[in-house]
């Protein structure tokens, strides 16, 4: 009995230490955010920037590879500046398509700075939740072929799923994070995750975290296992999501994107590095919204859905001293929520094919133009526009337009502008704190792309007007 009490006290002490450590870090970040929105912002930002460059040194981009089309030179300047100012600590690449034409393709830095391994055209990297957009494409292909409908109940293709209040959950609810299956009660091992039958039993028996259809909450990890179930049970050949994508997309169109990387290719993968405390403070000072990302898991109650997601599975860890996403065992796993491995040029080409109607019909693509769900997300507790497996960003040039795609942890992002036919893919192994437009490097690159596009469009309009006037004269 005494031993059990001692064990309980030790566990409680560990929890207190964990909470205390998180609180101290958040206090530092909180002070940084207060300074960021105060009149002292410019002085603080300049001081932090100088300190970061002094301590960690500037990154001299001496291995830039790629090109930009005429009129898009500003994108290259921003790409170089991201390194020179220390925002890119390791390596990065960006590829942009305008319809079926590459207008930007840049890469450089380090695949592994600690070992001196440079980023090359063959370097691949983990793109985290950007992988979810690829899962959404696979489901869209099966919908377009008539094998399933978004309105179908999941129990139509998976009768065992109709347990514990899940009988009315549709494929649409699952893809738009409305099913209430964001966190699992049963601890998941790596062996479980690689066992389709086991994960089938776990998800089928899981009781929803909230009444399905009433809320939307980000299914950060479970999305991958759920999409795998949808694909396996609707594909006439019964293939896993990784095999379906490889055979129907990657092999057919020559796309180097892996949902389950062959171990023989592990040497091509960049090493991911976490931001230091100094970099975290720097991000907050320049954009206090980053603090929200930190607060999602650090300030939520222990029994919150966000904490449950972070705790299970235990082998998914992104911390200062532990980053399991560098583990080759995980790289080989078919997990379409977080473990896609690719290059920016292949990621961009994949979604340019989507825009061209090469993977599923443009009629179906039109349904993805705007989010199905907006408002506060039940898990991350911030607005998270989403739908059909994609996340959305407001177009940086204003108006009511959306960019559709998916950001990933640390900055990796793919986004499509369906109106102008622009596809942007950005990947990086020096992880940042935010996602999507909260990632400074990506946001500045994205904005520069659309600024250049607007100038191109304005120039074309002037030329057309001058030509019309010349004909009239």
Swiss-Prot record:
It comes from the Eukaryota. Its main location: membrane. It is a multi-pass membrane protein. SUPFAM superfamilies: beta-lactamase/transpeptidase-like. It is found in: Membrane. Keywords: Membrane, Transmembrane, Transmembrane helix. Signal peptide: none annotated. The chain crosses the membrane at residues 26-48, 125-143. One of its GO terms (cellular component) is membrane. It holds the Pfam family Beta-lactamase. PANTHER family: BETA-LACTAMASE DOMAIN-CONTAINING PROTEIN 2 (PTHR43319:SF4), BETA-LACTAMASE-RELATED (PTHR43319). This is Beta-lactamase domain-containing protein 2. It comes from Caenorhabditis elegans. The gene is lact-2.
């Amino acid at each position: 009995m005494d031993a059990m009490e001692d064990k309980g006290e030790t566990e409680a002490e560990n929890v207190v230490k964990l909470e205390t450590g998180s609180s101290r870090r958040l206090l530092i970040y909180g002070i940084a955010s207060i300074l960021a929105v105060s009149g002292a912002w410019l002085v603080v930002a300049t001081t932090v920037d100088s300190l970061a460059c002094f301590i960690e040194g500037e990154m001299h981009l001496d291995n830039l590879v790629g090109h930009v089309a005429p009129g898009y030179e500003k994108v290259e300047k921003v790409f170089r500046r991201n390194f020179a100012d220390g925002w890119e600590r390791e390596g990065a690449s960006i590829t942009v398509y305008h319809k079926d034409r590459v207008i930007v393709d840049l890469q450089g830095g380090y695949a592994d700075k600690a070992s001196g391994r440079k980023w090359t055209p063959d370097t691949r990297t983990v793109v985290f939740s950007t992988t979810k957009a690829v899962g959404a494409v696979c489901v869209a292909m099966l919908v377009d072929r008539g094998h399933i409908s978004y309105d179908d109940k999941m129990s139509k293709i998976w009768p065992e799923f109709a347990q514990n209040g899940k009988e009315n959950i549709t494929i649409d609810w699952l893809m738009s994070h409305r099913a209430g299956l964001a966190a699992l009660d049963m601890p998941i091992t790596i062996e479980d995750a690689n066992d389709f039958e086991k994960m089938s039993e776990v998800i089928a028996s899981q009781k929803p975290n909230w009444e399905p259809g009433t809320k939307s909450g980000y299914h950060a990890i479970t999305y991958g296992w759920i999409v795998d179930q949808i694909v396996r049970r609707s594909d006439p050949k019964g293939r896993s999501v990784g095999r379906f994508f490889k055979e129907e997309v990657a092999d057919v169109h020559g796309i180097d994107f892996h949902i389950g990387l062959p171990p023989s290719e592990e040497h091509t993968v960049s090493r991911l590095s976490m931001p230091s405390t100094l970099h975290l403070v720097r991000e907050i000072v320049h954009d206090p919204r980053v603090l929200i990302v930190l607060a999602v898991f650090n300030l939520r109650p222990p029994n919150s859905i966000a904490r449950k997601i972070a705790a299970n599975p235990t082998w998914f860890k992104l911390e200062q001293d532990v980053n399991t996403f560098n583990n080759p065992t995980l790289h080989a796993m078919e997990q379409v929520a977080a473990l896609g491995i690719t290059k920016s040029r292949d990621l961009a080409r994949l979604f340019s094919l989507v825009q061209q109607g090469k993977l599923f019909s443009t009629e179906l693509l039109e349904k993805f133009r705007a989010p199905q769900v907006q408002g506060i997300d039940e898990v991350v507790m911030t607005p998270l526009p989403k739908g059909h497996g994609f996340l959305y960003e407001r177009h940086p040039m204003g108006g009511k337009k959306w960019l559709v795609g998916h950001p990933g942890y640390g900055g990796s992002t793919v986004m499509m502008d369906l109106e102008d036919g622009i596809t942007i893919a950005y990947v990086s192994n020096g992880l940042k704190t935010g996602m999507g437009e909260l990632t400074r490097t990506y946001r500045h690159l994205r904005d520069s792309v659309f600024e250049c596009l607007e100038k191109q469009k304005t120039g074309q309009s002037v030329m057309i007007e001058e030509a019309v006037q010349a004909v009239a004269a």
